[in-house]
Amino acid sequence: MGRLQLLDCTLREAPIDNLMWGEMNIHKMIHGLEMANVDIIECGFLKNADYIKGSTSFQRVEDIIPFLKNKKKGKTYVALVDYGRYDLKYLSEYDGRSIDAIRVCFKKNEIGLVLDYAAQIRAKGYQVCVQHVDTMGFFDEEIIDFIEKVNEFKPLAYSVVDTFGAMYEEDMLHYTGLADQYLSKDILLGFHAHNNLMLADANAQSYINKMSAHRDVVVDASLFGCGRSAGNAHTELIAQFINKKHEEKYNIDELLDLIDTVIASAQEVTSWGYSIPYFIAGIYNAHTFNVKQLLKRHNIKSKDLRGIIELLDDVQKKKYDYALLEKLYVEYFDNPVADALALEKLSNTFKNRNILLLAPGKSVAAEKEHIQKFIDEKKTMVIAVNNVISGYQLDYIFYSSTNRYNLRKFQECAPETKVIVTSNIQGAIEEDTTVVNYSSLIKFGWVNLDSSAILLLRLLIRCGVEGVYVAGLDGY
């Protein structure tokens, strides 16, 4: 049986702004992992930015020394660099007081450059580990060719990385098996999982069972799965699995103490873990920033989120082109209609009328007396936005949200109230409903490009309306 090692990457993976753990928590974490007998402790990132005390995003290895005053014999202390984002002018010669090894991750287009960079790190006395970003994004031939170069370079470790949490067991076994077949046995084989499909721990355990029987391996994990988006394999679960099924070596109580203290404090300022949006990202091996952006900008159903991500090609899924996402969002929902006659009819209806746009903010109830007095005095035509607003005589209701439109069947509305909908509304549309083109009302680049109130204002502009009154936009 080969040597089996556990690497904890909590201090680097945490979704905390600027990795600002606080100095005391960093001390607690490193000491606790040492006491738990974790083999490899990742202390954080090395980056070009000036170091801020309390962060685990370091500029120089000297910044890490205060946390490693009592390095434990037999443990390896590491940091990670993202190729191209760390200038080696900041890296001092190795003197044993700080980290022992540096992990270098790289993207597909950097595959021909990374080993030269790694050689410069090793020339300063550090052990080096190398790992792809998104192993699934490489062809087998590319991986084999790179591993042959890795064998010549002889780093401490080479890792397979499931960057987007998209690997099922057969995928993990394929890529780690490929690496196992071609990677020299005197180089550690590693595996780093993300939990988008809730498979990080299962895949890590399967990897351990398959590979540790015949070679030295390392598996990455973080306490309570702490990591960006869906998180990672769980250090405590993997440690318990190794204790139970392979070798009794890790102190689970020490890990639990860290979760109760340091991880609990992190949960007060951030969150991570499985969610449907991250599940969707995992299905398509897509960057989670894509789903985060769509959710940030739009109130969108999960099935529609999936449909939009599916429109991205394999390259686009790995990037986060926000302008492209907005374009695809509109295209996905757009259902073009010939609306020239509808616009002409609306234009004639709105001509020379005072128009009040009535949104469903709290003030429409709180200030009802004043608003109704205004309506009576100005003899306004009232157009409600995305809702049946009770207590008012509505001339029109404008809908651009399918959910809101479907709710109207459960709301009381005067039969004379007319309805305007945009063409993105899904499902059956009632007769005598005016339908206008959704995409014609969109202006790209705006933060709230599909806000119902903004779409209605654009419709009124298209109908030649030069001015409107507005009420109820508070808290909306």
How would you describe each model-predicted region?
Residues 1-340:
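Catalytic cores and adjacent flexible loops of soluble metabolic enzymes
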Residues 374-463, 467:
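Acidic/Gly/His-enriched mid-domain segments of enzyme catalytic cores or analogous surface patches
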Residues 191-193, 216-223, 356-364, 386, ...:
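Glycine-rich anion-binding loop/nest that anchors nucleotide
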Residues 111-114, 198-202, 364-367, 451-456:
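Short glycine/serine/threonine-rich phosphate/pyrophosphate-binding segments
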Residues 8, 79, 130, 191, ...:
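Structural beta-sheet core signal
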Residues 80-84, 107, 358-362, 399-402, ...:
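Structural motif
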Residues 89-93, 116-117, 203, 367-374, ...:
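A short acidic, amphipathic alpha-helical/loop segment
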Residues 327-379, 390-394, 406-409:
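N-terminal donor/sugar-recognition subdomains of glycan-related enzymes
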